[in-house]
């Protein structure tokens, strides 16, 4: 398993990537949902239930996947959801 510090580093990288992507797609307020989508993708790729259960040898692979993650369909859906919520306020 990854160390707690490595798990925290992966989670921080996920949060940073989510903020970057929400800015790129002009989707304000979707950072948490985007982070969840990235986290889900990493979990599905590595076959674990939690980032903390990731094998130590997969740490670099997971970090690279977080850096490269950019799912247009997911981000478009998050943006349209954020736009709808903004209109209802």
Where are these regions (language model features)?
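A general nucleic-acid interaction/assembly signal
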Residues: 1-89
